Amino acid sequence: MKRSKELITKNHSQEETSILRCWKCRKCIASSGCFMEYFENQVIKDKDDSVDAQNICHVWHMNIESLPEWISCLIQKAQWTVGKLNCPFCGARLGGFNFVSTPKCSCGQLAAVHLSKSRTDYQPTQAGRLMRPSVKYLSHPRVQSGCDKEVLLTGGGSKNRNHRLLNMARNNNDPGRLTEALCLEVRPTYFEMKNEKLLSKASEPKYQLFVPQLVTGRCTTRAFHRKSHSLDLNISEKLTLLPTLYEIRGKTTAYSRLNETQPIDLSGLPLQSSKNSCSFQNPSSFDPGMLLQRFSVAPHETQTQRGGEFQCGLEAASVYSDHTNTNNLTFLMDLPSAGRSMPEASDQEEHLSPLDFLHSANFSLGSINQRLNKRERSKLKNLRRKQRRRERWLQKQGKYSGVGFLDHMTLNNEMSTDEDNEYAEEKDSYICAVCLDVYFNPYMCYPCRHIFCEPCLRTLAKDNPSSTPCPLCRTIISRVFFQTELNNATKTFFTKEYLKIKQSFQKSNSAKWPLPSCRKAFHLFGGFHRHAAPVTRRQFPHGAHRMDYLHFEDDSRGWWFDMDMVIIYIYSVNWVIGFIVFCFLCYFFFPF
């Protein structure tokens, strides 16, 4: 009690922590710790109306040694030359950097890295007024603390700040609102408190601190919040609530999100509460692998039933700061046991780069801010397809081991699906373009060389067999040739379909119709026409043994000399009979 009184009476002044927000999306892009040392004097000059307009600085001068992570990435990408600074959330222009020829500002300072004041909003915020985001979208770290010995998540910080926070928490008697510092998406939440104070340790004012307002006595506080679609923690947006994206230099002990549809029982939590103190227990063991697994698995069951109100106990999650000697922004995760003291924890804490953390979770910065485009999705599909083919090949060879029962069933299903796809692709090469069915007695048409099945050709040549156009290119079909190899392949691969078409063709009248051919009458002595009988057409159904293609292909009358036709007709029976008749007539009219 004596120490508490000293804390209450000591230093009532509250130190301010300022942040910059994007003028377009209102997201936090930098804190006061990223500016030069003369930042406070610069703000005072800007507020003074009597200052000359020429001496007013219109940019925020950034400290190169403590730049935010997103600015450092842009500078390294530009290889420390010249570039623009765009908002990492909405892409709006915020400022720029120039290390080639460093310009000077109107205030006389170098503007190597600067943010424009007209494109950013300066917000001085009381350290005690900054609230943490919704408890539903943060992890649930538990810390062991007491009045005599403070064991906190933060790796460092001043004790005066802790005393000031305790003083503000005890003097806050009216029901407060659990507001947000980063406009996270939250829903109305009820929580009961039996505590009067919460011991926490904060860092320098340049880092963000989220402190829930405490209410003395037993009361129920309802928090109404605005909805923002920017930083919702779910799987589809790839863990956008990472502290590294908001310039929070600290270490966080994260836990999986609790189920939103079930009330939270405080009896299961190692929470110790009394009238004068509120302490949180730190688990004795923690697996960082389970952290990533819970981050990626837990929200699947809860994101479909969001928006409901539920009763919960006091959920505390704090984001703390840490002093780092490095220039780049680091993400510190503290994994000490409950029995370890603060110096031991600070000596053995793990330093993880934000990029290493994202790569370890199989995420990329591009996938956090936007979804995969079509090209990336097609690449992923191709990789999965190649992997499935390799697994099938190894399974056929008997070398694929280590596959469980479910994986085996999945592989079998994928194999059957791929086999069906391959079967469909093979069947496409044996389908007629007219009837859209497999070939039955296919014929190749000349001169266009398109292939169609016999029922389709006979149907097309029903009305005009001598000038039948090709159904694809509209070329007049002069002759057709039967394709034996294609017919045998169709009969072998698609036996059922082939037999079904054969039966329907034999039962239909199309079997009596002619095939298309430019069979013109051979004009003999200018008037006698030679026509082929339908019986002859049925005797040679496949056309490979007929000589129909040797007929004339024009409408000329009388004799049209062709040596091939002469030779053929000399050996024909008609000429033999004609020669005998000619000899008989000569003997009858011209006797010797």
UniProtKB/Swiss-Prot annotation:
Pathway: Protein modification; protein ubiquitination. InterPro entries: RNF180 (IPR033263), RNF180_C (IPR045790), Znf_RING (IPR001841), Znf_RING/FYVE/PHD (IPR013083), Znf_RING_CS (IPR017907). Keywords: Endoplasmic reticulum, Membrane, Metal-binding, Nucleus, Phosphoprotein, Transferase, Transmembrane, Transmembrane helix, Ubl conjugation pathway, Zinc, Zinc-finger. Residues 586-592 are extracellular. Signal peptide: none annotated. One of its GO terms (biological process) is positive regulation of proteasomal ubiquitin-dependent protein catabolic process. One of its GO terms (molecular function) is zinc ion binding. It holds the Pfam family zf-C3HC4_3. One of its GO terms (cellular component) is nuclear envelope. The modification Phosphoserine is found at residue 230. It catalyses: S-ubiquitinyl-[E2 ubiquitin-conjugating enzyme]-L-cysteine + [acceptor protein]-L-lysine = [E2 ubiquitin-conjugating enzyme]-L-cysteine + N(6)-ubiquitinyl-[acceptor protein]-L-lysine. It is found in: Endoplasmic reticulum membrane; Nucleus envelope. The chain crosses the membrane at residues 565-585. Residues 1-564 are cytoplasmic. SMART domains: RING (SM00184). E3 ubiquitin-protein ligase which promotes polyubiquitination and degradation by the proteasome pathway of ZIC2. Interacts with ZIC2. The RING-type zinc finger domain mediates polyubiquitination of the interacting protein. This is E3 ubiquitin-protein ligase RNF180. The gene is RNF180.
